[in-house]
Amino acid sequence: MVNILCVHWGNKYNGTYVNRLYRMVSKNLNLPFNFYCYSNNNFEYNKNIKIIPITSNDLEIYWNKLAMFQKDFVPPGPCLFFDLDVVIQKNIDHIFNYLSSNLTMIKAHWKGDIITYGESRKRKERWDMYVNSSMLLWQSNKCTNIWEHFQKDPD
């Protein structure tokens, strides 16, 4: 069983994005899966979506993604996270072939050669990451060091 996750925090996206993501995964994943949404919203999600409530925390925007790396956040197994604005058009079974003991992220190839040692050649832009977190792949309980490090040093 694989774990599919998303985060629905705040009001940038409404709950229809969560339900739409669930439908795209259902259509394009042949593996058995559980779909989890880490949420602080009271939207009426699809009945097959398991809600993990965001308890009172000080995390904002994308920082809530880090909570997924807590110990026992979801049952054991592979975890695949998608941002709510991701569009899935084809089968995604093969993504799990990239599963390792580390976190797997998408290379931000679209940043191209404008990246030079973390600085963009374009004025007033800064690129300090060569990866994108709109899709993340990891084994549950194998990347707890990410959450633990963040808890020790949130800045």
What is the role of each PLM region?
Residues 1-155:
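Glycosyltransferase catalytic domains, chiefly GT-A lineage
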